[in-house]
Amino acid sequence: MVLILNIETATKNCSVVLAKDGETISIREIATQNFSHAEKLHVFIEELFAETNLKLQDLSAIAVSQGPGSYTGLRIGVSAAKGLCYALSVPLIAVDTLELLARKITIDNGIIVPMIDARRMEVFCAFFDANYNKIRETKAEIIDENSYQEISET
């Protein structure tokens, strides 16, 4: 049995998922306009394990969003994940937030451009091909209706 605790705190959403052999068995999440990661993250983790009657010691690994995203949110999620991994002697799996968003979409050809609010009128974005290979590195940029004109013309 492979049991992975998944932590996402890169955006205003705070979510924790417990997956067993690749299938979600329990989830807790909140999406608000205010960041509540510090208050909710550890409570959510405790609730998942109470609901499933599993123990932290049953974990095979912990996966955490590595960003890009909210600096404070990422620090909260990564710190919690690293602390648990150290205490439990399990591997830490860092996952690219934009790649996760890209993998929610299936295309035969073309480019996937996931974006996350970077504040100050900017977005974090990267380009992925249909096989989810990153073809342009992550950047924070201000976009407008003409920002990706050269891509849409190809």
Tell me what each language-model feature is:
Residues 1-66:
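N-terminal beta-alpha supersecondary unit
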Residues 9-11, 72, 97, 154:
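Ser/Thr-centric signal marking residues that sit
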Residues 12, 67-68, 118-121:
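Short glycine-rich anion-binding loops that position phosphate/pyrophosphate groups of nucleotides
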Residues 23, 91-154:
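Surface "functional belts" at beta-alpha junctions
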Residues 32-40, 71, 75, 79, ...:
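Residues at secondary-structure transition points
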Residues 45, 80-84, 102:
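Buried hydrophobic packing segments
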Residues 50-57, 86-97, 107:
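Phosphate-handling active-site elements
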Residues 61-92:
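DPxDG-like acidic metal-binding loop motif
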